[in-house]
């Protein structure tokens, strides 16, 4: 007869768990967790770039239990931490590098470059929808209890409400999305989030990037545009109806001696008053 016993432990907010290498207290902040895992794995990464973003990444806090012995540390980090931070992670000359996603960081992101379409920076596709479901009503489940196998708390972004409550809020992008597309609901479970502010940040980030639908164009550019990177925001003008339209680079590759860029085109009057 095989017997199986389960044991659970609990501890205070500043007790137990992994501790930080350089500061006192538990390892809970998003940027610190990324640096800790990258360092322990002996991966090549851009230390200065990660440290430079700590003031932003450490606004997101994570806690929880890891009981999956088959998942690798890097896969766990990507799926449970990095995917909820306002960054795009790329491989650069310095190794694994974070690029701040300015669409998450600000409702009205500033452009870094202004470009008018020309023979050296040429749009080669029409505006095409990306395969990304629209969401404007988002329920976030967090505070996962391993002992009870359930989430102990939740928050909701609801575009229909007129008066906000402690755990149910509205959002300008969600409201605009609801007016355009009707109600689009989704539930997101966050097993490593216990902090209320972090839950709200992640909820608004998801609404921000998925509330209005995602469209894209592809650009072919000469080598002189090698300075453009994933995550950069440009003001693009072209004959297809774009006039200083803010776009974000979401893809970059090298093909037949030219750069290929994929630009995210957003129809958001807060950012692009002229529209498409």
Where are these regions (language model features)?
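Extended acidic/polar, glycine-enriched regions
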Residues: 1-3
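C-terminal extracytoplasmic interaction modules
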Residues: 7-276
């Amino acid at each position: 007869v095989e017997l199986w016993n389960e044991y659970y432990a609990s501890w205070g907010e500043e007790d137990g768990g992994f501790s930080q290498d350089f500061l006192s207290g538990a390892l809970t902040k998003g940027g610190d967790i990324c640096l800790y895992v990258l360092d322990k794995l002996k991966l090549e990464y851009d230390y200065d770039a990660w440290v430079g973003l700590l003031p932003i990444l450490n606004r997101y806090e994570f806690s929880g239990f890891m009981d999956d012995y088959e998942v690798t540390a890097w896969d766990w980090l990507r799926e449970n931490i990095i995917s909820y931070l306002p960054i795009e992670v790329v491989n650069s000359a310095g190794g694994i590098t974070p690029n701040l996603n300015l669409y998450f960081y600000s409702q009205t992101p500033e452009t870094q470059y202004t470009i008018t379409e020309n023979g050296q920076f040429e749009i080669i596709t029409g505006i095409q929808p990306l395969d990304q479901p629209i969401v404007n009503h988002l329920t976030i489940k967090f505070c996962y209890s391993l002992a009870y196998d359930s989430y102990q708390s939740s928050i909701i972004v609801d575009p229909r409400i007129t008066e906000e409550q402690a755990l149910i809020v509205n959002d300008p992008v969600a409201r605009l999305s609801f007016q355009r597309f009707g109600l689009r609901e989704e539930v997101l479970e966050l097993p490593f989030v216990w902090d209320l502010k972090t839950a709200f940040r992640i909820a608004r980030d998801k609404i921000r990037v998925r509330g209005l639908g995602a469209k894209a164009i592809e650009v072919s550019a000469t080598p002189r545009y090698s300075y453009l990177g994933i995550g950069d925001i440009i003001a693009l003008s072209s004959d297809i109806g774009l006039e200083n339209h803010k776009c974000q680079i979401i893809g970059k590759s090298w093909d037949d001696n030219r750069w290929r860029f994929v630009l995210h085109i957003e129809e958001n009057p807060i950012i692009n008053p002229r529209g498409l």
